[in-house]
């Protein structure tokens, strides 16, 4: 089979938006607004609109997002959360952070 379709070709995916990405990254690094700040607020507003949602909250990591999601669902001590063992460890961390027990299936 001489012609294989690449499983993952990040350079091809980025090529069409590279100049825009470089400009936004440079602006963000120059004004150090990569945590909170006006760019984050604008992203949250735009993404909420795009999703048809009233609100959007950006997080610094998937761990933080999972942790807050579990808190908002009132998951806590004594609860069990069904998860998969085939995931990043942050999934289990977030469950443990709220005092719940991960149950792997």
What are the language-model segments listed below?
Residues 1-72, 76-77, 97-98:
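Conserved PLP-binding active-site segment in aminotransferase class I/II-type PLP enzymes
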Residues 71-105:
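PLP-dependent aminotransferase-like
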């Amino acid at each position: 089979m001489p012609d294989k379709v690449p499983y993952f070709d990040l350079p091809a995916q980025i090529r069409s938006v590279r100049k825009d990405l470089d400009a936004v990254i440079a602006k963000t690094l120059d004004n150090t607004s990569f945590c909170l700040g006006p760019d984050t607020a604008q992203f949250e507003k735009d993404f909420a609109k795009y999703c048809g949602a009233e609100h959007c909250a950006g997080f610094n990591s998937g761990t933080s997002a999972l942790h807050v999601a579990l808190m908002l669902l009132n998951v806590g001590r004594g609860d069990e959360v069904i998860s998969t063992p085939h995931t990043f460890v942050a999934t289990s961390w977030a469950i443990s952070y709220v005092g719940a027990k991960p149950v792997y299936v």
